[in-house]
Regions:
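A short pre-motif secondary-structure segment
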Residues: 36-37
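Charged, low-cysteine interdomain linkers and short loop/connector segments
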Residues: 1-14
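Short helix-to-turn junction characteristic of helix-turn-helix DNA-binding domains
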Residues: 40-44
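Short, Lys/Arg-enriched N-terminal segment that forms or immediately precedes the first helix
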Residues: 12-26
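Short alpha-helical "recognition helix" segments of helix-turn-helix
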Residues: 49-51
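A short hydrophobic/aromatic micro-motif that marks alpha-helical segments and, especially, helix-coil
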Residues: 45-47, 72
């Protein structure tokens, strides 16, 4: 769990959209998971908003977010 906290801090610290997209392009995340991360970290949307926007339950978005963090932590 602490790895996810560090990964979240690093994602929040990415200065530009381009750098963020390069990181996501290097990952094996699905397009949906990439969009969840973009909405949450770049546009600062909460999970309820993201779920409503993408047509999923908030809990589903939270689970996908955590799995995505686990998948990309090795890129840092």
């Amino acid at each position: 769990m602490s790895e996810n906290i560090e990964t979240r801090k690093k994602l929040k610290g990415i200065a530009s959209i381009t750098q963020f997209d390069v990181l996501l392009d290097q990952s094996t995340l699905s397009d949906l998971d990439k969009e969840i991360l973009r909405l949450h970290y770049l546009k600062e949307k909460d999970f309820r908003y993201i779920g409503d926007t993408l047509g999923f339950a908030e809990v589903t978005i939270k689970k996908r977010h955590l799995k995505a963090l686990s998948k990309i932590q090795s890129l840092f």
